[in-house]
Amino acid sequence: MLQGMLQRTCLAVVSTAQTLIVRDKHAFNRAVLKPKVRCHFPKPMEVKRINVHGWNARMSTPEGRRVLMNRILKGRHNLSH
């Protein structure tokens, strides 16, 4: 009985650790965070939206990186367009 409890506890700890490792791998992977592209992309205004508010635009300036960090700290799932 004690051995069974220990095995279940160890399995629970291992599965929790595996879940945490998987989540850490995907924390900033854009393909996992935002997997779908809009169906009729690129419409002209969507191109402008991506160019102005997109990931590359945010990462290219210090203020944009500050915006992304604030969104990360706030717990947003979608960091940028």
Swiss-Prot record:
Domain of life: Eukaryota
GO molecular function terms listed in the Swiss-Prot or TrEMBL record: structural constituent of ribosome
Compartments it resides in: Mitochondrion
Listed GO biological process terms: mitochondrial translation
One Pfam family this sequence matches: Ribosomal_L34
UniProt KW NAD keyword: no
KW Transit peptide (keyword) present: yes
Keywords noted in UniProt: Mitochondrion, Ribonucleoprotein, Ribosomal protein, Transit peptide
InterPro entries linked: Ribosomal_bL34
A GO CC term attached to the entry: mitochondrial large ribosomal subunit
The family this protein is said to belong to: Belongs to the bacterial ribosomal protein bL34 family.
Quaternary organization: Component of the mitochondrial ribosome large subunit (39S) which comprises a 16S rRNA and about 50 distinct proteins.
Protein name: Large ribosomal subunit protein bL34m
Gene assigned in the entry: mRpL34
